[in-house]
Amino acid sequence: MSKKPVRVAVTGAAGQIGYAILFRIASGEMLGKDQPVILQLLEVPVEKAQQALQGVMMELQDCAFPLLAGMEAHSDPMTAFKDVDYALLIGSRPRGPGMERAELLAVNGAIFTAQGKALNAVASRNVKVLVVGNPANTNAYIAMKSAPDLPAKNFTAMLRLDHNRALSQLASKTGKAVADIEKMAVWGNHSPTMYADYRFATINGESVKDMINDQDWNANTFLPTVGKRGAAIIAARGVSSAASAANAAIDHMRDWALGTNGKWVTMGIPSDGQYGIPKETMFGFPVTCEGGEYKVVQNLPIDAFSQECINKTLKELQDEQAGVAHLL
C-alpha cells in the first residue's frame, strides 16, 4: 500500500541552501524512501528569483524522482503554506556590509511575522516547522509567536549544524569514527555563543571527556572552532556554508519525523522551563525523538563552566528577543 503524499514547503527555494536540499528531499532522504512528497516552493516576488526557481524545478523534473508527487512555485506564503505537513524556512535576509544586528533583526522580523501568520492561517495543525534562516532561534521565536493557534512545540530552530560540526571535531581529535560518538549535546543559540558539550559523550561506551582530558583544548580550541566554523568557511570559500546547512536540516527533520532510536541529537525548541531556561525561549537542547515528537534529555548535571556557557548564550538570546518584542 503506497503512502499518501505529504506536503513540504521550502522557502528561499532558489537560494544556495534550497538548491542543496530540494533534490535530497525529493529522493526520500528526509522522510523515507517510501514517502511521496509534494514540494510547495516559496521565493520572493521578484522576477529574477521566480525565474531561478523555475530553473530549479526543471532540474527536479529531469531527475524523474519516483517520490516527487508534485511541485508548485509560489511568491505568497498564504498559498505556499496551504495544508503543509512540513515547513523548512530557509529564506532570510543575510547581514549586509555595515548592517547593524538590530537592522537585521527588524528586516527578518517582518519576514518571519508574515510567515508565522500564514502558517497559522493555512498550514496543517500538525505542521513541523524548522527555521534555518539566521538568526535562526530568534526567527523561529518570531514565527512561533505569530502563530498562536498552532502548538508552540511545532516550531524549531536548527542547531544540528553546530551539533554535526562538534561531532566531526571530536572524531578528528580522538581519531575515532564520527558514527560511534553518542550523547553529544549543544546548548543555546545558533551563533558563536552556542555551547557544544561533550561531558556525557561516549565512543563505544568510553567517555570522550576522559579520552581527551584537556579542558584547555575544550575552552580555547574546540568551542571557538565549532562556534566560528561558519566564518571560517566564508573566509575559505567566499560564500557561506550551504551544503552542510542543507545536510543538517535533512538530519533534523528526518530525526524529528522518523525518530532517533534513543540517540541524542540537538534541536532548538521552545523551552518548557528545563534547566532553568525561561519558558518559550527558543533554545538548543539535547533531545531524543520518537513517534514524531521530541523530548528533552532530563536531569543532566550542569557544572560551573557549563553553567557559565549556558548563561552567556541565554543572555544573547534574551537580548535578541527583546530586540524583536516590538514586532510581536
Curated annotation (Swiss-Prot):
A GO term, aspect molecular function: L-malate dehydrogenase (NAD+) activity
Keyword NAD: yes
EC number: 1.1.1.37
Reaction equation(s) it catalyzes: (S)-malate + NAD(+) = oxaloacetate + NADH + H(+)
Matches recorded under SUPFAM superfamilies: LDH C-terminal domain-like, NAD(P)-binding Rossmann-fold domains
Residues of the active site: 190
Key words, A-Z: NAD, Oxidoreductase, Tricarboxylic acid cycle
Binding site for NAD(+): 12-18, 108, 115, 132-134
Residue positions binding substrate: 95, 101, 134, 165
InterPro entries (UniProt xref): L-lactate/malate_DH, Lactate/malate_DH_C, Lactate/malate_DH_N, Lactate_DH/Glyco_Ohase_4_C, Malate_DH_type2, NAD(P)-bd_dom_sf
HAMAP family xrefs: Malate_dehydrog_2
Role according to the record: Catalyzes the reversible oxidation of malate to oxaloacetate.
Family: Belongs to the LDH/MDH superfamily. MDH type 2 family.
Protein name as annotated: Malate dehydrogenase 1
Organism: Albidiferax ferrireducens (strain ATCC BAA-621 / DSM 15236 / T118)
